[in-house]
Amino acid sequence: MSINAFKHNIPDKTFAKLNTEGEFTRLAVSPGIINKHYTPEQFQKIAEIIGEKGAIKYSTSYSILLSVPTIEVSRTIKELEQVGLFIAQQGSIVSMKACDFCDGDKMEAAAITEILYERLVGIEVPKRLRINMNGCASACYNAVYDDIGLVYQKDSFDVYLGAVPMGRHAQAGELFAKKVPVQFIEQLLQAIITCYQSHSRKDEPFHKYYHRTKSADYWQRLIQ
């Protein structure tokens, strides 16, 4: 066993600790929606920005979380974007992540992924709604464990809804629609989002909303 595996279990700086000393903002940073590979220049820029004043944390959402002074957020975002880094939007909106399409070997779904990102990400919803796109049937980035899971295969998508991503009741989403043609997937997702906006309770997470209402007639009408 490596001597460093458990040598430093409690970090010196966390987002919570930093906010006891001043006002900090957390930025979710990655090389992009599909690309998962950082460059040395990007890591150098991250280290330069954070220095001794902030904090860096790995997350399970394929991004690095940077805690930076709130007064420096605008400048920080500009510097990160100049080296090709992507900063995810925060808040109660539709968000998206994707697999790496086998590091670019299976790019069939890349074009529709970009279209869906441009059309859907940022739409306001009752609680943050996570769409996870996987580019082949292997689904090795666990699309079925997000609010809306999309698994691409042969010009179509299987759509999974209502996963409980964590906790003792964690479970995969249910197969809601099978082999939805690429040309209809945006329309279906827009309809699902509209249902969530229209019929959810205040601050109700998508998985609770879906399991509470999945017997409602409007769900069946979406896939007829």
Residue ranges and their predicted role:
Residues G135, V144-H207, W219:
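Mobile "lid/hinge" segments at catalytic clefts and subdomain interfaces of large enzymes
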Residues R26-L27, P31-K154:
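Small-residue-enriched alpha-helical segments and adjacent helix-cap loops
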Residues E52, D203, H207-Q224:
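Membrane-embedded hairpin module used as a gating/binding unit in multi-pass transport
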Residues I49, E79, R119, L188, ...:
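Residues that form generic nucleotide/phosphate-binding pockets
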Residues Q42, E72, I112, I185-L188, ...:
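Alpha-helical structural motif
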Residues M1-K45:
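N-terminal basic/disordered segments at the start of proteins
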Residues A16-E23, E52-Y58, V164-P165:
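Short, flexible, solvent-exposed loop/turn segments with mixed acidic/basic and small polar residues
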Residues L80-V83, I192, T213:
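Alpha-helix boundary/capping residues
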